[in-house]
Amino acid sequence: MHDQQELANQLSTGSAHAGCILDEPATQRCTQFLELLYTWNKVHNLTGTLCRSEAVSRHLLDSLSIAPLLKGRRHLDIGAGAGFPGLPLAICRPADQWTLLDSRGKRVAFLRQACATLELTSVVAVHSRVENYRPTENFD
């Protein structure tokens, strides 16, 4: 089992290679997100990833790898599920506005709890099917 510092080091090094430099508070938020995900996953089966180290590389770093490609400031994550890629990207780019859309209530409940716990005020989790969703503003 990996400790928090090992995961933080893996995340810090990997995010730099992915082109999304995380400062220490952002790295800490990502590892907190991972712990929250694992706590919820025991009951709600949000992701099938086996170990935390794998989750860093398969989920967090994969999500962060698209950060340099994003244009604009308003983003929509359709089928947000367990929060990938939306939540890691929101941690990496906190000045942007993020809407995480999912049709399953348990996932949206997790996303809302994660946003509250991590104090991600630029993120809104919406419980809706994409074909029924009517945003009040356009996304970039």
Regions found by a protein language model. Give the residues of each.
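Class I SAM-dependent transferase core
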Residues: 2-72, 113-123
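Conserved SAM/SAH cofactor-binding pocket of Class I
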Residues: 61-140
